[in-house]
Design a protein with these regions (language model features):
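Anionic-ligand-binding alpha/beta catalytic cores of soluble enzymes and soluble regulatory domains
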Residues: 136-214
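Active-site histidine-anchored catalytic micro-motif
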Residues: 19, 44-50, 64-67, 75-79, ...
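Surface-exposed interaction regions enriched in Ser/Thr/Asp/Glu
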Residues: 274-281
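A conserved acidic, glycine/proline-rich C-terminal tail/linker
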Residues: 204-269
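Structural motif
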Residues: 19-22, 48-51, 80-83, 96-98, ...
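N-terminal glycine-/serine-/threonine-rich phosphate-binding loop
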Residues: 2, 6, 14-93
């Protein structure tokens, strides 16, 4: 990872010509928050294209926010500005950041919500935003998304150099997403990271963690979630019988436990944080 003056000026140039700002929050859509943020952005940069990635991140759940932005950001054009506000520490001493990679800018609180970006991007520059003249005044301690993050994103869209906002930092908050671990010689233990809108259980298990599940001849295995033992991997949701629970490789790159036209979470009575055990060989066949 490169920190400091390492991001080419081409990103700044493309932002100025074609400003796209994405929004990822846990604010929901029942209140005025999102509309107000868009109003602030457009008042500063009327040419901004504002794209909603997601406003249904689980409330206060920084890991869910990190997963959400990590799945979406790379599909946007070079120069896109991603505002990510999942901010249970709003109004405290936690820092507002601008993080720049070779292709994108991120505006977010320094609470780890960009942790998966830090893992994936090799060249990054992070800055603590201290230039209060870029803020909407007076700053509310309960709505930094309106008063700090939105105007900062808008000024970036206008082409203001990230260096103008504050000093470079290297001690930003980051965490590692939970990784599967060997429970014993025959069992790999993962966890449900999130439950999507359809009730699919998205685990933290990748094909690299469990190649035996996704090869042409997977051998004997079972996936244990709650009280249910699952012994099939399907290639598409519709290949399961209605209500059948099975494993599938999801578009996020993780093993999912899913049900055809049903909610695996409801059928199994489990949710985020539930253990997912993959048992192999004779240990799987013996029960």
């Amino acid at each position: 990872m490169c920190l400091g003056r390492c991001v080419p000026g081409a990103v700044r140039d493309l932002v100025a010509r074609n400003p796209i700002i994405t929004l990822t929050t846990d604010f929901g859509t029942n209140d005025h928050f999102i509309g107000t943020m868009k109003g602030v952005i457009l008042s500063i940069e009327p040419d901004a294209q504002i794209i909603d990635i997601c406003h249904s991140v689980q409330a206060f759940d920084v890991l869910d926010g990190a997963l959400t932005i990590s799945q979406a950001y790379s599909y946007f054009p070079t120069g896109t500005i991603h505002m990510v506000v999942v901010d249970p520490g709003v109004g405290t001493a936690r820092r507002p950041l601008i993080v720049s990679s070779d292709r994108h800018h991120f505006v977010a609180p320094d609470n780890g919500v960009l942790s998966l970006i830090y893992q994936r991007e090799q060249r990054l520059s992070a800055r603590h935003v201290t230039g209060e003249h870029y803020f909407l005044q007076p700053v509310s301690n309960t709505f930094h998304a309106r008063d700090i993050f939105s105007p900062v994103a808008a000024y970036l869209a206008k082409g203001v150099d990230p260096e103008k906002f504050g000093e470079a930092v290297t001690d930003f908050v980051r965490f590692s997403a939970p990784k599967p671990k060997a429970a014993n010689e025959n069992t790999l233990r993962g966890v449900v990271l999130k439950v999507d809108r359809f009730g699919n259980l998205i685990t933290n298990i990748t094909p690299q963690d469990a190649p035996m599940l996704f090869g042409e001849n997977p051998g004997t295995f079972k996936i244990v979630v709650g009280q249910r033992e699952i012994r099939e991997i399907k290639e598409a949701y519709a290949l399961g019988a209605p209500g059948e629970v099975f494993g599938i490789m999801g578009s996020m790159g993780y093993l999912e436990v899913a049900a055809n036209r049903g909610s695996a979470a409801q059928l199994l009575g489990v949710g985020k944080g539930t253990d997912v055990n993959i048992v192999l060989g004779e240990a799987a066949a013996g029960q």
